[in-house]
Amino acid sequence: MTPVGEILSREILATGPIRFHRFMSAALYHPELGYYRKARDPFGRLGDFFTAEQIQPVFGILIAQCIRQLRDEMADKNDFIVVELGAGRGEMSPALGDCGYIGVDHDRGAMPESFCGVVLANEFFDALPVHVVKRTDAGFIERRVDFADGEFQWADGPAVSGALAEYVERFAPEAEIFEVNLDALEWMKRIQRSLRRGFVLIIDYGYTQRETIRFPRGTLMSYRHHSALEDVLAAPGERDITAHVAFTPLMQCGLETIRFETMAQLLLRAGEKDQFAAAMAANPQQLKTLLFGMGETFRALLMRGEK
C-alpha cells in the first residue's frame, strides 16, 4: 500500500468512510506524500502526462500574445500583471517576459490583494479536489470512500447538505453520478475579491450544463505513465486524479463572460500565419495534436471583471 493509502486507511478504520474530497486532497496534495508534492516530476515524457506547453512550445507564445492583446484593451497598462493559477514548472513565465508575473498554486502562494491584469488558469481547475454525488430514488447522496478487504471502496453516504445541496439544486446534471467542484467556486470568489480590473482566462477540458448527458457516471479519471485509468481509488499518491471542469457554474459566478470556445479557436485567433508555419515545419505532429487533438477537447473561457 502507498504511504498516503496507509494514512487514509487508518483514518477510515478509526472514524468511518470519508468524503472523496478528503481522499483526493490527500492523494494529490499531502504536504510530503501527495502526488504533486513529492520530489518526482509528474510532467513530461518520463512522467504521467503532458501539458499543452510541453507538447508544443508555440502554445506558450500564443497564450502570451493573447494576454498582451487583453493588456492593450486596458487603460492602466503599467500596473498590469499576470497571475497564473497552477503554474507548475513555470513554463509560461518566460513567454510573459514583458508582463509582471505571479505564480499561485493550489495551496501555495497567495493572490495579490488588489491588481489589474489577467488571471490565467491553464489545466488548474481539473486537479482541484471534488465531491462525488449520486442520484437515487430517495434523492441525492454524497458518495464516500471506505476501506475493506485491504482496498479502498466506494460507499453510499448521507443526503447532500449545505453548500453541496445548494449546488445540486442549481446545477445537478441528468447523470447518475457526477462531481461537484466547490473548490473551483471558492477560487472564483478569491479572484473576484482580488481582481480590481481585468480578465480571467480558464483553459481546461470540461463541459457545459447541456453537455452533461455525455457523462452519465461522472468524469473522474486517474493517470499513470500516460495511461488513463478508471479506478481512481487505487494507489493514492502515486497517480494523478482529475475531473472535467463544469463551466456553467463558473460562468454564473458574477464575472462577465466574453467568449467560450475551443482552445484551437483561441490559439488560431491569437497567432499569426508565420508562427504556425514555423511550428509545423519544426514538428507537424505536435502542432496537429495541439490544434486538432487537445485543441478541440480543451475549452477556453474568457471573462472580464471590474470593480
Where on the chain are the PLM-derived regions?
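Conserved acidic residues
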Residues: 116-117, 198
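Conserved RecA-like P-loop NTPase ATPase core
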Residues: 59, 119, 204
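Rossmann-like AdoMet
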Residues: 1-111, 115-116, 262-265, 274, ...
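Long, Lys/Arg- and hydrophobic-enriched amphipathic alpha-helices
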Residues: 162-307
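A residue-level signal for conserved active-site and pocket-lining positions in enzyme catalytic cores
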Residues: 27, 119, 250
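Generic detector of well-ordered alpha-helical packing
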Residues: 85, 106, 124-127, 205
